[in-house]
């Protein structure tokens, strides 16, 4: 995980932008396929504050939703609504 500095909106809501790396194996058409990729995330409020306190490099299970970065963007970003550190 790489993260930017915790910032606040004019309304006082905490915002944390970060990128994560996923490494996993899936089965597609009866063949195993290894996936390795980075993806962008954003967290708001208490989740952003808690995630900012986590050390880099810990395995995590993320929950949330995927949405365009902005209204007119074709780039996607995952909005983290919950996370759990896994060991």
Where on the chain are the PLM-derived regions?
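Single-stranded nucleic acid-binding surfaces, predominantly the OB-fold ssDNA-binding core
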Residues: 1-87
């Amino acid at each position: 995980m790489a993260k930017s500095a915790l910032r606040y909106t004019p309304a006082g809501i905490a915002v944390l932008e970060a990128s994560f790396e996923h490494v996993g194996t899936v089965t597609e058409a009866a063949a195993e396929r290894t996936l390795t990729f980075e993806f962008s995330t954003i967290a708001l409020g208490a989740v952003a504050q808690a995630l900012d306190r986590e050390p880099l490099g810990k395995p995590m299970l993320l929950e949330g939703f995927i949405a365009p970065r902005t209204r007119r963007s074709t780039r996607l970003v995952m909005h983290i609504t919950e996370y759990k550190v896994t060991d």
